[in-house]
Structures are given as structure tokens and as C-alpha cells.
Amino acid sequence: PIQIFETPVQKLGSYDKENHFYMKRDDLLPFSFGGNKVRFAREFVEDMKEKHCDSMIIYGNYHSNLCRILATLCHQLSVPCYMIHNTEDIKDNCETNNSRIIRRMGVREIRCGKQTIAEAVQTAMDELTEKGYRPYYIYGNTRGEGNEHIPMRSYEKTYDELYNWEKENHTFFDYIFLASSTNATQSGLLAGSLKYEDNCKIVGISVSRNEKRGKEVIAGN
């Protein structure tokens, strides 16, 4: 149900006469209100199918864009979906559009704290296995290791779109700025830049991790 197309690059108006600003319009991706996590979700579900799994375990909270998109995708595919909900992550319990959508998608919630995430993932895996399913955890094993490359490759592919756009429009980017949380989008863009050896600077503006931890994650990816 997820159709990925080459999203447009739009020039933005600016009073800055020395620099030109452009935006890659991934908000136009036509699934569950769009955004970069749509590309992640497409890669996760394809990987799930390649591994012959038939149920999905997601991780996050009710404010998460990725959880919203994956919950919607599982609902459309009639795939059982369990959400590992770290209740220590976000204290705010107010209703949002994300939380309303997730709750309506029939997600089975398993609550945990920061120190019990692995146990919660194992509980979800055991429950699904007992029901006869082959569970797929989006982040790999119970420690969240093994699938780092899956969301990354979605934005390595997106870099191909940017590279082709640059050649077609004879306009070449010096910098790419993005909001960076789990660092998967940034890692994928860096992989694309390294592939083409174009020396474009990929600058992540962290919305969660500190600089030291962000660099460690990117280096590990």
C-alpha cells in the first residue's frame, strides 16, 4: 500500500541574497500524512516479507510518527502489530492525532521502562510465537541490534534522487540540513554522499540525542 515516488525539490523564498534554499518535499508521500518515516516503513515491511515474518513489533510511543505509520500499514495489511511503549520516554499523556490514529489501528501495547525494553520485546515475540506467528522486530534482536541498515538504506536511495536532480537542474548542494533523532536518515544520506564522493556536508539538527551520542551512532552505522 505504500507507493514511493521521486518527491519534488522546491526552491524556497528567502531574503538571503548570498544563499539559496531548497526543500525535498517528502511530506507529499501519499501514505499516513507523509514524511521521512514513510520511506522507513516501506523498507521495514519489505524486509519483514523477505524474512518470511507475518507480524510486526514496533517500538516507540503514542506521539511517534513512525509508530503511526507502521500501525496504519499493519492495519491495512491485516498484520498483527505489537507496540513496545517505553513509558519513561515521554511523560506527556495528552491526546494527539498520532495517538488517536495508533489507538484505532488495533495495536497491542506492551509497556516498559528504559531498563526493561529487551524483556518487553521478548514478551511480544513469545506471545506472537505462541499464537503461531513469525514476529519481526523492526530494530532486530531484543537489544535493538541488527536492523540498523534497514531505515538507513531508504535515504541512501533518496540521495540517488537528489544526485539526479542536481545533474538535471545544474544546481549542486553544498549542505543538507535535517532534523535528526535516531540518526538513521542522516546515516543514509551520508552513505549516499560517500557513494558519489560529492563532499556535500550533511548536518543533523538533533531533536533527542546529544552530539557525542549522535556521532557514536552514526559511526557505528
Question: What does each model-found stretch correspond to?
Answer:
Residues 1-221:
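PLP-dependent amino-acid enzyme catalytic core
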